[in-house]
Amino acid sequence: MHKKPYSKQRYIAASYACTKDISAILTKCLKLIEKQHHMIGRQYEKNYGINPMWILHNSSTVHQSFADFNLKKNAKDIRTYDFTTLYTSIPHKQLRKELRWVIKEAFKSSKHSFISVYKHNASWTNSPGKHTEHLDCNKVIRLMNWLLDNIFVTFGDKVFRQVIGIPMGTDCAPFLANLLLYSYEYKWINEQKELKNWHVLKHFRNCSRYIDDLLMINNADLMKKYMTDIYPKELVLVPDDTDGKSCPFFFFSICKLPSQIPSYLLQSTI
Protein backbone atom coordinates (compact mmCIF):
# COMPACT_ATOMS: atom_id res chain seq x y z
CA MET A 1 0.00 0.00 0.00
CA HIS A 2 1.52 3.31 -1.06
CA LYS A 3 1.24 6.04 1.51
CA LYS A 4 0.24 9.58 0.55
CA PRO A 5 2.13 11.57 1.52
CA TYR A 6 4.98 9.11 1.34
CA SER A 7 6.37 8.28 4.76
CA LYS A 8 10.06 8.73 5.44
CA GLN A 9 11.73 5.41 6.24
CA ARG A 10 15.34 4.96 7.30
CA TYR A 11 17.09 1.78 6.19
CA ILE A 12 20.19 0.25 7.73
CA ALA A 13 22.04 -2.56 5.99
CA ALA A 14 22.57 -5.77 7.98
CA SER A 15 24.20 -8.12 5.48
CA TYR A 16 27.22 -8.69 7.73
CA ALA A 17 25.47 -8.60 11.10
CA CYS A 18 26.65 -11.25 13.56
CA THR A 19 23.03 -11.94 14.47
CA LYS A 20 22.07 -12.93 10.91
CA ASP A 21 22.43 -16.71 11.39
CA ILE A 22 20.33 -16.64 14.57
CA SER A 23 17.74 -14.45 12.87
CA ALA A 24 17.57 -16.95 9.99
CA ILE A 25 16.87 -19.83 12.42
CA LEU A 26 14.26 -17.78 14.23
CA THR A 27 12.63 -16.88 10.91
CA LYS A 28 12.08 -20.55 10.04
CA CYS A 29 10.65 -21.21 13.51
CA LEU A 30 8.32 -18.21 13.42
CA LYS A 31 7.13 -19.10 9.93
CA LEU A 32 6.10 -22.54 11.22
CA ILE A 33 4.53 -20.99 14.32
CA GLU A 34 2.51 -18.57 12.20
CA LYS A 35 1.32 -21.47 10.04
CA GLN A 36 0.13 -23.22 13.21
CA HIS A 37 -1.83 -20.12 14.21
CA HIS A 38 -3.49 -20.08 10.79
CA MET A 39 -4.77 -23.57 11.66
CA ILE A 40 -5.88 -22.32 15.08
CA GLY A 41 -7.73 -19.46 13.38
CA ARG A 42 -9.57 -21.76 10.98
CA GLN A 43 -10.72 -23.96 13.86
CA TYR A 44 -11.77 -20.86 15.81
CA GLU A 45 -13.87 -19.78 12.83
CA LYS A 46 -15.58 -23.17 12.68
CA ASN A 47 -16.45 -22.88 16.37
CA TYR A 48 -17.43 -19.21 16.61
CA GLY A 49 -17.97 -17.88 13.09
CA ILE A 50 -15.01 -15.47 12.99
CA ASN A 51 -11.34 -15.97 12.14
CA PRO A 52 -8.94 -14.02 14.40
CA MET A 53 -6.04 -14.64 12.00
CA TRP A 54 -5.89 -11.68 9.59
CA ILE A 55 -2.33 -12.14 8.30
CA LEU A 56 -1.85 -12.58 4.57
CA HIS A 57 1.31 -12.86 2.45
CA ASN A 58 -0.04 -12.44 -1.08
CA SER A 59 -3.01 -10.94 -2.91
CA SER A 60 -4.76 -14.24 -3.74
CA THR A 61 -6.69 -14.19 -0.44
CA VAL A 62 -7.92 -10.67 -1.20
CA HIS A 63 -8.96 -11.71 -4.72
CA GLN A 64 -10.92 -14.66 -3.31
CA SER A 65 -12.60 -12.45 -0.74
CA PHE A 66 -13.79 -10.05 -3.41
CA ALA A 67 -14.98 -12.93 -5.58
CA ASP A 68 -17.11 -14.15 -2.67
CA PHE A 69 -18.60 -10.68 -2.17
CA ASN A 70 -19.30 -10.38 -5.90
CA LEU A 71 -21.15 -13.67 -5.80
CA LYS A 72 -23.25 -12.72 -2.78
CA LYS A 73 -23.60 -9.05 -3.82
CA ASN A 74 -23.46 -7.84 -0.24
CA ALA A 75 -20.44 -5.51 -0.02
CA LYS A 76 -21.40 -2.26 1.69
CA ASP A 77 -18.15 -0.47 2.50
CA ILE A 78 -14.41 -0.91 2.24
CA ARG A 79 -11.60 0.86 4.05
CA THR A 80 -7.89 0.51 4.69
CA TYR A 81 -5.79 1.48 7.70
CA ASP A 82 -2.05 1.90 8.08
CA PHE A 83 0.31 1.66 11.05
CA THR A 84 2.35 4.81 10.48
CA THR A 85 5.69 3.65 11.93
CA LEU A 86 5.26 0.02 12.91
CA TYR A 87 8.81 -1.34 12.88
CA THR A 88 10.37 1.67 14.57
CA SER A 89 7.69 1.92 17.27
CA ILE A 90 7.42 -1.65 18.58
CA PRO A 91 8.07 -1.69 22.36
CA HIS A 92 10.45 -4.55 23.22
CA LYS A 93 8.74 -5.34 26.52
CA GLN A 94 5.39 -5.87 24.84
CA LEU A 95 6.97 -7.72 21.93
CA ARG A 96 8.59 -10.21 24.32
CA LYS A 97 5.35 -10.71 26.25
CA GLU A 98 3.07 -11.17 23.24
CA LEU A 99 5.47 -13.35 21.24
CA ARG A 100 5.98 -15.56 24.27
CA TRP A 101 2.21 -16.17 24.28
CA VAL A 102 2.16 -16.76 20.51
CA ILE A 103 5.01 -19.27 20.67
CA LYS A 104 3.57 -21.18 23.64
CA GLU A 105 0.12 -21.41 22.05
CA ALA A 106 1.60 -22.75 18.82
CA PHE A 107 3.57 -25.48 20.62
CA LYS A 108 0.49 -26.38 22.66
CA SER A 109 -1.69 -26.61 19.56
CA SER A 110 0.88 -28.62 17.59
CA LYS A 111 1.12 -31.30 20.31
CA HIS A 112 4.85 -31.49 19.60
CA SER A 113 7.79 -30.72 21.86
CA PHE A 114 10.37 -29.54 19.32
CA ILE A 115 10.90 -27.67 16.09
CA SER A 116 13.53 -29.20 13.81
CA VAL A 117 15.30 -26.62 11.66
CA TYR A 118 16.57 -27.57 8.21
CA LYS A 119 18.31 -25.67 5.42
CA HIS A 120 15.16 -24.22 3.88
CA ASN A 121 12.37 -24.82 6.40
CA ALA A 122 11.38 -26.14 9.82
CA SER A 123 8.92 -28.77 11.05
CA TRP A 124 7.28 -29.99 14.25
CA THR A 125 8.65 -33.14 15.83
CA ASN A 126 8.72 -35.15 19.03
CA SER A 127 11.86 -37.06 18.02
CA PRO A 128 14.44 -34.69 16.53
CA GLY A 129 17.41 -36.18 14.72
CA LYS A 130 20.65 -36.41 16.64
CA HIS A 131 22.47 -34.15 14.19
CA THR A 132 19.53 -31.87 13.38
CA GLU A 133 19.24 -28.38 14.85
CA HIS A 134 16.16 -28.44 17.07
CA LEU A 135 14.53 -26.13 19.61
CA ASP A 136 11.90 -26.58 22.29
CA CYS A 137 9.43 -23.86 23.24
CA ASN A 138 11.67 -22.23 25.83
CA LYS A 139 14.67 -22.19 23.51
CA VAL A 140 12.71 -20.41 20.78
CA ILE A 141 11.69 -17.79 23.35
CA ARG A 142 15.28 -17.43 24.61
CA LEU A 143 16.52 -17.06 21.04
CA MET A 144 14.04 -14.28 20.40
CA ASN A 145 14.96 -12.50 23.64
CA TRP A 146 18.67 -12.79 22.86
CA LEU A 147 18.15 -11.29 19.43
CA LEU A 148 16.21 -8.35 20.87
CA ASP A 149 18.92 -7.81 23.48
CA ASN A 150 21.62 -7.67 20.81
CA ILE A 151 20.37 -5.20 18.23
CA PHE A 152 23.18 -2.68 17.76
CA VAL A 153 23.68 -0.04 15.10
CA THR A 154 26.95 1.60 14.10
CA PHE A 155 26.94 5.19 12.88
CA GLY A 156 30.39 6.47 12.09
CA ASP A 157 32.57 5.66 15.09
CA LYS A 158 29.62 5.31 17.47
CA VAL A 159 27.65 2.20 18.47
CA PHE A 160 24.03 2.39 19.61
CA ARG A 161 21.83 -0.29 21.13
CA GLN A 162 18.27 -0.31 19.81
CA VAL A 163 15.76 -0.47 22.68
CA ILE A 164 12.59 0.52 20.79
CA GLY A 165 11.58 -0.95 17.46
CA ILE A 166 13.20 -3.63 15.31
CA PRO A 167 15.35 -3.24 12.17
CA MET A 168 13.39 -3.85 8.97
CA GLY A 169 16.46 -5.56 7.51
CA THR A 170 16.42 -8.35 10.10
CA ASP A 171 15.28 -11.63 8.50
CA CYS A 172 12.61 -12.33 11.10
CA ALA A 173 11.32 -8.73 11.40
CA PRO A 174 8.14 -9.28 9.31
CA PHE A 175 7.21 -12.33 11.39
CA LEU A 176 7.85 -10.53 14.68
CA ALA A 177 5.70 -7.57 13.59
CA ASN A 178 2.95 -9.75 12.10
CA LEU A 179 2.66 -12.04 15.11
CA LEU A 180 2.75 -9.14 17.55
CA LEU A 181 -0.26 -7.53 15.86
CA TYR A 182 -1.95 -10.92 15.55
CA SER A 183 -1.70 -11.45 19.31
CA TYR A 184 -3.57 -8.19 19.95
CA GLU A 185 -6.19 -9.00 17.31
CA TYR A 186 -6.75 -12.53 18.57
CA LYS A 187 -7.07 -11.49 22.22
CA TRP A 188 -9.48 -8.65 21.46
CA ILE A 189 -11.69 -10.90 19.32
CA ASN A 190 -11.64 -13.58 21.99
CA GLU A 191 -12.56 -11.01 24.64
CA GLN A 192 -15.54 -9.85 22.57
CA LYS A 193 -16.55 -13.48 22.11
CA GLU A 194 -16.45 -14.07 25.86
CA LEU A 195 -18.59 -10.96 26.34
CA LYS A 196 -20.96 -12.26 23.64
CA ASN A 197 -20.62 -9.03 21.67
CA TRP A 198 -21.67 -10.71 18.44
CA HIS A 199 -23.18 -7.44 17.17
CA VAL A 200 -19.63 -6.04 17.17
CA LEU A 201 -17.82 -9.14 15.93
CA LYS A 202 -20.02 -9.48 12.85
CA HIS A 203 -18.33 -6.33 11.51
CA PHE A 204 -14.85 -7.86 11.94
CA ARG A 205 -15.40 -11.04 9.91
CA ASN A 206 -13.77 -9.67 6.75
CA CYS A 207 -10.38 -8.34 7.81
CA SER A 208 -7.05 -8.85 6.07
CA ARG A 209 -3.67 -7.46 7.06
CA TYR A 210 -0.44 -7.33 5.08
CA ILE A 211 2.02 -6.54 7.88
CA ASP A 212 1.18 -2.87 8.63
CA ASP A 213 -1.63 -2.41 6.09
CA LEU A 214 -5.14 -3.41 7.14
CA LEU A 215 -8.15 -3.99 4.85
CA MET A 216 -11.67 -3.95 6.32
CA ILE A 217 -14.81 -4.93 4.37
CA ASN A 218 -18.30 -4.26 5.75
CA ASN A 219 -16.78 -2.93 8.97
CA ALA A 220 -19.07 0.14 9.09
CA ASP A 221 -16.00 2.07 10.28
CA LEU A 222 -16.13 0.33 13.68
CA MET A 223 -12.35 -0.08 13.59
CA LYS A 224 -12.11 3.68 14.17
CA LYS A 225 -14.00 3.16 17.43
CA TYR A 226 -12.18 0.06 18.66
CA MET A 227 -8.62 0.39 17.32
CA THR A 228 -7.29 1.90 20.56
CA ASP A 229 -8.82 -1.03 22.46
CA ILE A 230 -7.16 -3.55 20.14
CA TYR A 231 -3.67 -2.06 19.75
CA PRO A 232 -1.40 -0.29 22.27
CA LYS A 233 -0.94 3.48 22.09
CA GLU A 234 2.60 3.11 20.72
CA LEU A 235 1.25 1.58 17.50
CA VAL A 236 -0.68 4.34 15.76
CA LEU A 237 -3.30 3.16 13.26
CA VAL A 238 -4.51 5.68 10.68
CA PRO A 239 -7.56 5.21 8.39
CA ASP A 240 -7.47 6.16 4.73
CA ASP A 241 -9.14 9.41 3.71
CA THR A 242 -11.55 7.93 1.14
CA ASP A 243 -15.35 7.79 1.12
CA GLY A 244 -15.48 4.08 1.94
CA LYS A 245 -16.14 3.12 -1.69
CA SER A 246 -12.54 2.87 -2.89
CA CYS A 247 -9.12 2.53 -1.30
CA PRO A 248 -5.49 1.56 -1.94
CA PHE A 249 -4.26 -1.81 -0.69
CA PHE A 250 -1.42 -4.22 -1.49
CA PHE A 251 -0.07 -2.12 -4.40
CA PHE A 252 -3.57 -1.98 -5.92
CA SER A 253 -6.40 0.50 -6.14
CA ILE A 254 -9.65 -1.22 -5.13
CA CYS A 255 -12.97 0.27 -6.20
CA LYS A 256 -16.57 -0.65 -5.51
CA LEU A 257 -18.55 0.29 -8.63
CA PRO A 258 -21.26 3.01 -8.41
CA SER A 259 -24.00 0.48 -9.18
CA GLN A 260 -23.53 -0.75 -5.59
CA ILE A 261 -23.05 -4.26 -6.96
CA PRO A 262 -19.97 -5.41 -5.09
CA SER A 263 -17.39 -5.54 -7.83
CA TYR A 264 -13.78 -4.52 -7.91
CA LEU A 265 -11.14 -3.08 -10.17
CA LEU A 266 -7.53 -3.83 -9.37
CA GLN A 267 -4.90 -1.59 -10.89
CA SER A 268 -1.21 -1.78 -10.09
CA THR A 269 0.27 1.43 -8.73
CA ILE A 270 3.86 0.41 -9.39
Please provide the spans of the model-predicted regions.
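Inter-domain linker/hinge segments that demarcate the starts of reverse transcriptase
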Residues: 19-33, 58, 182-188, 193, ...
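Conserved polymerase palm-domain catalytic core
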Residues: 64-229, 242-249, 256-257
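Secondary-structure transition/turn motif
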Residues: 15-16, 219-220, 269-270
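Short helix/loop capping segments that flank catalytic or ligand/cofactor-binding pockets
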Residues: 8-10, 20-23, 34-35, 88-91, ...
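Amphipathic alpha-helical/coiled-coil segments positioned at domain termini
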Residues: 6-10, 164, 269
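Short, intrinsically disordered, charge-balanced linker/junction segments flanking boundaries
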Residues: 1, 267-270
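Long, internal stretches of domain cores in catalytic or enzyme-like folds
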Residues: 237-241
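Non-catalytic, regulatory and substrate/membrane-recognition segments associated with hydrolase enzymes
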Residues: 1-77, 84-85, 100-104
